[in-house]
Amino acid sequence: MSSTLTCYCPGDGSLLGEVKLFNKSDIDQSIILAEEAQKEWKSTSFAERRNFLKALKENIIRNQDKYAEIACKDTGKTLVDAAFGEILVTLEKINWTLANGEQSLRPTKRPNSLLTSYKGGYVKYEPLGVIAALVSWNYPLHNALGPIISALFAGNAIVVKGSELTAWSTHQYCEMVRSLLQSMGHSPELVQCITCLPDVADHLTSHSGIKHITFIGSQPIAKLVAASAAKQLTPLCLELGGKDPCILTDDHRLEEILSIVMRGVFQSAGQNCIGIERIIALDGVYDTIITKLYNRISTMRLGMYTQNDVDMGAMVSNNRFDHLESLIQDAVSKGARLVYGGHRFQHPKYPKGNYFLPTLLVDATNEMKIAQEECFAPIALVFRAKSPEHALEIANGTEFGLGASVFGRDKQLCQYFTDNLETGMVAVNDFGAFYLLQMPFGGCKKSGYGRFAGYEGLRGICNSKAIAYDRFSAIHTGIPPAVDYPIPDSQKAWQFVRGLMGTVYGAWISLVPNVYQLWRNS
């Protein structure tokens, strides 16, 4: 078996280079190096960690052309796609962590009660040690740097396993972080970047040195990761697929909204976990929306990031083209209308590129396979809803529950959808705004569990240690004689405890008899 992985550009098929494939021994060594580095890093102050993030932010801004081009070469996306999906979101995450990270991880006081009035309590958020992030290929810079930012700020070290499909770029981004750490006097071994094939990946996910795993990917692989992690009872955050609905209720600001919808569908050629997979339009605007979508989609230009006249790039691989075409034909056979696209595209300039035509498929229903599977492709799938209730039924009619978006002038109607959508996130009159806001990111149903980003994400990669203490030096917990071992009289002990419960938790009208019972049996 080869010890290296050969990487190609999906936009034109050109050779990018080779990346080392790790074996089990390599993984063991990476974790040992990370463990040693973390022992020192966990003692750094929040100010020191902020200094590193500020330097990382400056590095990204200064080299954004270079980093965007690396992402484009390895994924086939356009520069605009890289700007939105790689650079902007990473800088926003850094900014949020700089402003809110310390507050997220400061010890938090917890309330007491009448019974515990002499006690104080707080929760301390401690580093776990070495954590792992197994990330998908659609956003190699952001998917690698996002977990690194959180891990390092929380005092952890991290092992990043990128996808084999984008190993070339993931390796470069991680090396950039390692070099930056070293230049600031910190150990570069805090960040380990590994590439391995599935038969070796199990060694990482079942490794006793890994204290938490974040996985971004598909359901089938998530089940393997979860089973592997269970060998060590390693906690998981699973961010899986979505079939995110976009509900259009009226024609208010329709042209502006369709611009947002187009970005939500075709960003990175539709390879976006929170991308719009289903457009659900109410009867009154359905036909208008189809016409306007066709006018836009039919003029989209495909090509490489180096072109000036390109709207959409290649897909990262052509290994799903047969299945995508099959899903579209299945839908057509069941009553859907293929208005535009629907098949792979042989680019005249880049015949070895992985291009799929932007597609408009309308009159979809939940009975079609394409309505139930995540496409992860440039497909605008449109459903007609007879009523708000019908729109909600369509939206909730899949096994997924990641994100959703709702557009409309009627705030009460938008709130109806927000309250009843079975998803982890909803954007009202916008697409994906919850991500930029650094809110807890994740889904429900079969879109995974756990959250990253926000307060919840940072605390999720820490040990939440609950600490109770005496508020007053002269007041301590004491065991009343009636219940102290050896218990003198079990019946009187029971009556004593019963009186205590009534005194502390009972209605005020029964306070006197409960206090009497407590005194009598003490």
From Swiss-Prot:
Gene3D superfamilies: Aldehyde Dehydrogenase, Chain A, domain 1, Aldehyde Dehydrogenase, Chain A, domain 2. Its EC number is 1.2.1.-. It holds the Pfam family Aldedh. One of its GO terms (molecular function) is aldehyde dehydrogenase (NAD+) activity. Coiled coil: none annotated. GO terms for cellular component: cytoplasm; cytosol; nucleus. It is an enzyme of class 1 (oxidoreductase). This is Putative aldehyde dehydrogenase-like protein C21C3. It comes from Schizosaccharomyces pombe (strain 972 / ATCC 24843).
